[in-house]
Swiss-Prot record:
Protein name, per record: Capsid protein
GO CC terms of this entry: ribonucleoprotein complex; T=3 icosahedral viral capsid; viral nucleocapsid
Keyword annotations from UniProtKB, A to Z: Acetylation, Capsid protein, Ribonucleoprotein, RNA-binding, T=3 icosahedral capsid protein, Viral nucleoprotein, Virion
Family from the record: Belongs to the cucumovirus capsid protein family.
Sequence ranges of Basic residues compositional bias: 11-21
Domain note: The N-terminal arginine-rich stretch does not seem to be the major RNA-binding region that allows formation of an infectious ribonucleoprotein complex.
Length: 218
């Protein structure tokens, strides 16, 4: 046997264990399939618990989804009498509503008190009929129907209440920027009159990126 034949034979000998070991992955494949099924069930369980417009969740700071950015609206409720209500539709700037077909994935609401705040308020984001005038009676009915999960914000002696944010996931609804006028922030001042300078609401609307101007205005 010459040198080339010896080398070829050596290669074949090295390959045989690899070919012979191919029966082993059948067991590994079965284990992998079981693991995949378990992960699939876990994902379904987690998906069921993800926040929606009807079942929001408390959140900390989160990064935007890839390809998305956010537009913030700041609301300062006027004076609200004890046991009364306030509502404001989500009206985005014209520079954003120009792209009304861009999808909206999430709405986050943050409640920040000003120094004078010493009350309890209920806050929610709710889809409201276009015909609604957001009167006290209309808002009261929406809080009373049980379909409006709320963030209860109370006076915190030091700093800001730990759970001061709610996140609403709209991705399954395929909502877009044009739909945002159908949503409103609703506030209920439960125990005390809320003064004009007591509370600030920050509404962050996460939506698909829109073109931005590269030229400064004149």
């Amino acid at each position: 046997m010459d040198k080339s034949e010896s080398t070829s034979a050596g290669r074949n000998r090295r390959r045989r264990p690899r070919r012979g070991s191919r029966s082993a992955p059948s067991s590994a494949d079965a284990n992998f399939r079981v693991l995949s099924q378990q992960l699939s069930r876990l994902n379904k369980t987690l998906a069921a618990g993800r926040p929606t417009i009807n079942h929001p969740t408390f959140v900390g700071s989160e990064r935007c989804k890839p390809g998305y950015t956010f537009t913030s609206i700041t609301l300062k409720p006027p004076k609200i009498d004890r046991g009364s209500y306030y509502g404001k539709r989500l009206l985005l700037p014209d520079s954003v509503t120009e792209y009304d077909k861009k999808l909206v994935s999430r709405i986050q609401i943050r409640v920040n008190p000003l120094p004078k705040f010493d009350s309890t308020v209920w806050v929610t984001v709710r889809k409201v009929p276009a015909s609604s005038d957001l009167s006290v009676a209309a808002i009261s009915a929406m809080f009373a129907d049980g379909a409006s999960p709320v963030l209860v914000y109370q006076y915190a002696a030091f700093g800001v209440q730990a759970n001061n944010k709610l996140l609403y996931d709209l991705s399954a609804m395929r909502a877009d920027i044009g739909d945002m006028r159908k949503y409103a922030v609703l506030v209920y001042s439960k125990d005390d009159a809320l003064e004009t300078d007591e509370l600030v609401l920050h509404v962050d609307i996460e939506h698909q990126r829109i073109p931005t101007s590269r030229v400064l205005p004149v």
